[in-house]
Amino acid sequence: MAGSYGETFDGKILDDLSGAWVEKHNWSDILRRLTKIKFALQADRDMIPGIVEDLSTEIPVDENTRFPSGKVYHLLTKEMLMAIEAIHAASSFKRRAEEKNNVNPRQRFEAESSSSQLPSGGLVVRPAAGSGDSSLGEDLFSNSKLDDASTAFHKSLATLKGSRPKAVVQRTFEKEYSLRWTAAAPVAAAGGTPPGGRSWTWNLV
């Protein structure tokens, strides 16, 4: 229904509308999908940015648009926004070895074979320990970083699931910000009968 909040749409409401408002079902869906993530799997980590992008943080309200009837919204706190950012950041982790050796198993086998030499005596001579990168060292470093990223992800997700953002509906929203919605006056069609009025016919002699 057309109308306006008029002069009541001022003050604190203007500041709060710039915050992150999330519709209840959208919020529940995001939490459900994040909960299903198996962080140890790269394929699952790659899904996280898309999930976060599906979070809609705008509320369709302005001076001439009333808070949606029948909808429930949450205003996310600073702590919740930081947790979401931490989850997004953690998803960018990739194992160093996977990035460096982004080749198929056959290529990796051939590369490892070429690092060995077989002299006439049949003795295999391998590169001295410490010459070049250490695969074991890289794996340990990578696993340590994965643990850090996994901890950040699960801790932040626990923060979001444990939060209890206030549920806001049309009535509580308008009460909170002292808003008064005034419906626009109906416009009578030309030559028609105004709502609630009478139709008069004048006979001119």
Curated annotation (Swiss-Prot):
Residues 98-111 have a biased composition (Basic and acidic residues). Residues 98-130 are annotated as: Disordered. It holds the Pfam family TMV_coat. The keyword Lipid metabolism does not apply. GO terms for cellular component: viral capsid. It is found in: Virion. Keywords: Capsid protein, Virion. It comes from the Viruses. The lineage of its organism: Viruses, Riboviria, Orthornavirae, Kitrinoviricota, Alsuviricetes. GO terms for molecular function: structural molecule activity. Gene3D superfamilies: Tobacco mosaic virus-like, coat protein (1.20.120.70). InterPro entries: TMV-like_coat, TMV-like_coat_sf. It comes from Tobacco rattle virus (strain TCM). Its main location: virion. This is Coat protein.
